[in-house]
Amino acid sequence: MHATAIAEEAVSAPRQSTIFDIDNPGFREDFDEKPFEFKHCFTADHPMFQLPRIRKVFDDPRVMHHAYYDHGAIPVDMQWVNLPERKMTSKEVFDNIETAQGWMMLRHLEKDPEYNELLEQCLDEVKRLTGRKIDGDKKSQEAIIFFSSPNRNTAYHIDRECNFLMQVGGLKQMNVFDRNDRDVTPEAELESFWSKDNNAGKYKPQFQDRAYVFEMRPGTGVHIPVNSPHWLRTYDQVSISFSISYQYKDTRRKHVYQANYYLRKLGVNPTPPGRSAVLDNTKRAIVSTGFAGKNLVKKLKGK
């Protein structure tokens, strides 16, 4: 499902009084349900996304403590635990990003006051455009810059965050799958993901044609709902992306999947979340009070 055609130049920005395009119905209709494309006002000309300003982050231990990077050829289906051994430092990858085959994630930029101001501005506008009371739902919020070499994949994965990814420099293709498609993401994968394994999501090339495919360029962004599997690739330019995201404070989804994980390990075929409010509430109560394994099965069977 191709969302846009590729363009070599940045799209026209939204009205200057806003960060996002205020007339986009996706914010209100599809927020945290379906991926959608939007426009934004950030490009590489913005002072916070120029390379010297980003490079300053490397001198901030509050941010660099959470930074992650890798380099080398990465196939779409590679698990994060199997990534190539790093032979360059983060600064070396950044300074040689055009040739390093690198991918860098500068996390928790909100610890830098200037980036935190951008994050707050973005989330305030998201609240207004979606009509959602995000502050009451969120556990945490985060700003991230992604920095990628030309012709580089980011492997298929699932995130716990509700995310708005904005392309700032270069071109990038985003492939997002419907989180409710159980051919793409079986219940067992989600159970494992929420219980113990960040690498639980497995890419299945036979279902690639079900992806929402977005061709991102400076001034465009993609909303990625929680649990929506995705993978990315860059083209012939260095790619810079800015992400704003938050995690839900509500643990209901997590606890039901964790309960089902234990049930499946014990040979039970568990009822997926959302099918029975009674079962879901029972599972949440049991997991939240520390029951697991056989105790969980006995409790759910009424023994």
Which ranges hold each PLM region?
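Active-site-adjacent segment of 2-oxoglutarate/Fe(II) JmjC oxygenases
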Residues: 206-208, 254-289
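Catalytic micro-motifs at enzyme active sites that drive phosphoryl/nucleotidyl and oxygen chemistry
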Residues: 24-26, 91-95, 131-135, 150-156
